[in-house]
Amino acid sequence: MTSRYNSVLTVQDLHFSYNSHPVLSAIDFGVEAGELLAILGPNGVGKTTLLKCINAIFKPKGGCVLLEGRSVLELRSAEIATRIGYVAQKSETSRFTVFDAVLMGRMPHVRWKIGNHDLKIVDAALRRLGLTHLQLRYIDQISGGELQKVALARALVQEPGLLLLDEPTSSLDLRNQIAILTLLRRVVDEHGIAGIMTMHDLNTALRFAHKFLLLKDGAVFATGRVEELTGDMVAEVYGLRVDIHSIGGYPIVVPMDCDTNHPHPGHTAEPHDHTP
């Protein structure tokens, strides 16, 4: 199947159901190199499920996910690991040190043994994310925010062409949220990586993403550049009247009050223990 997009990632007519319960339907979009896309929508709308379909953790019931023109279902797991960096919303803890946990991201690239090149890449990622002082600590001894940084560092050392991040700043304070997303945007811009992040905070998403994908009832309601998001779109999806202003060149969503003409949309339940 040929792609309708000149994209690193192309999602075409994707459908996913858990047992007989539809979660996603007719999802179409593409992400190009050097673009950061924010997937937005209410709780339970299917954002995490979509990321897991892209990463071949879940197999769609219909449609396809193409990575540079190839179906992800045709790729071996080792190849996916070198081409897609995935940061889950909740990272597992273990008795790895921070250094070893980040080094695990290099494993898909290692042929015989870990070399100096791999160690330098890990050192650079630890410095970029402010983790050097924690590198000998066990990851079950660090905070949730620090654990999110470790997960991002591990994804970055994979040197992927596509980054998938599920609520990458959910456990971070405001200062660290800004620092991490500034770094993420810089990596995408400077290295030509395609990035996708799911977000609940609209203002943070609009501040750092190039484009948005707004989901409602498991389908694409609207997509475009962040400056194209309108108050009517937000009201329809979230059931909340808002004004959107430009401050410092960035769109800012200002909630007004709940719109009784747009009640909060119903959720699509996502699989237990397989999605958040």
Labelled PLM ranges:
Residues 40-42:
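The feature captures the beta-strand-to-loop junction immediately N-terminal to the Walker
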Residues 55:
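Helix-to-loop junction immediately C-terminal to a conserved catalytic motif
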Residues 63-71, 80:
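Conserved ABC transporter NBD signature motif
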Residues 103, 116-134:
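Conserved ABC ATPase "signature" region
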Residues 138-142, 146:
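Conserved ABC ATPase signature
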Residues 163-167:
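Catalytic Walker B motif of ABC-type/P-loop ATPase nucleotide-binding domains
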Residues 237-276:
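ABC ATPase nucleotide-binding domains
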